[in-house]
Amino acid sequence: MPKVQLKILDSRLGKEFPLPDYATAGAAGLDLRACIERPLAILPGATKLIPTGLAIYIADPRFAAVLLPRSGLGHKQGIVLGNLVGLIDSDYQGEILVSCWNRGAEPFTLAVGERIAQMIFVPVVQMEFEQVETFTATLRGEGGFGHTGRH
């Protein structure tokens, strides 16, 4: 298993709140928690940047981390990521912050230590552009946004 360096920035992690870990052998994501000092109200339509109390350093440019919303918060409470998905580059070393957006109709109170997002690690391929005047024709061509049909 590849290694990622982890820096604990909030002393409550590992004591009051568990460190990120895979819940099951088949789990793809690690839960990130709100390392806030007091409950935080997020009004409808508002976004808040939430500290997680940790920083990671992936180092290997063949990998990146992706932050995703927790399905229960999004479906039941209307809390999703303000940027829809977060990307942590391999060379980033600062605190992981989660942009929380309340797309619901009611205020939402985020509890201290609440699980707010999940983080997965993904492979990365850096491509090199080759500038051309035309592309080799394909069946699809420039068709997009529903071009292949609804059903």
Curated annotation (Swiss-Prot):
Family per similarity comment: Belongs to the dUTPase family.
A single GO molecular function term of this UniProt record: magnesium ion binding
Highest taxon above the source species: Bacteria
UniProt catalytic activity: dUTP + H2O = dUMP + diphosphate + H(+)
Entry keyword set: Hydrolase, Magnesium, Metal-binding, Nucleotide metabolism
Cofactor(s) in the UniProt record: Mg(2+)
BP GO annotations: dUMP biosynthetic process; dUTP catabolic process
CDD domains: trimeric_dUTPase
Pathway connected to this protein: Pyrimidine metabolism; dUMP biosynthesis; dUMP from dCTP (dUTP route): step 2/2
Name of one Pfam family that matches: dUTPase
Protein name: Deoxyuridine 5'-triphosphate nucleotidohydrolase
Listed InterPro entries: dUTPase, dUTPase-like, dUTPase-like_sf, dUTPase_trimeric
Binding residue positions for substrate: 70-72, 83, 87-89
EC number(s) reported in the record: 3.6.1.23
Function noted in UniProt: This enzyme is involved in nucleotide metabolism: it produces dUMP, the immediate precursor of thymidine nucleotides and it decreases the intracellular concentration of dUTP so that uracil cannot be incorporated into DNA.
